[in-house]
Amino acid sequence: MAGRSTKKTAKTSTNKKSTKLAVKRRAAKLTLLAGGNPQIAKADGDAAVQAYIAAMPGWKREIGRRLDALIVRTVPGARKAVKWNSPLYGVEGQGESKGWFLSFHCFTKYVKVAFFRGASLRPVPPAKSKSKDTRYLDIHEDDQLDEAQLAAWVKQASLLPGERM
């Protein structure tokens, strides 16, 4: 009996170690919220946005990289932050920020790009919002991204008064 008890204790000890290790690994991984949107701590700067993009699941990560590169190319020196688990892009004004002009967010089947003053863009981005000013562009996995049109919207949006958040 003593031998059995020792084997069982050794086995239980091994299981506890494995469980603790698995819990630590899960805690180290990023959490994906509803629709696969990464949960990233609120922070200012490029590092937070890059952490968000790196945590975007599957094909959405490449969309995030392309969006970030296009925004930076179109609006050099754009201000970046992550708030409410979404990257935000803004422009510095005279002495203070003019506000945020764009954000994006992962959903189950698409990445939603939000133009906070989208109703003022020409042409107006296709998807409406509950907010009269905001318009969206939903990017699905197999969509052909019209980068010229997107860059035009980004440029226009960066010149408008931004959202204060």
What role is predicted for each listed range?
Residues 2-165:
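Charge-dense, helix-prone N-terminal extensions
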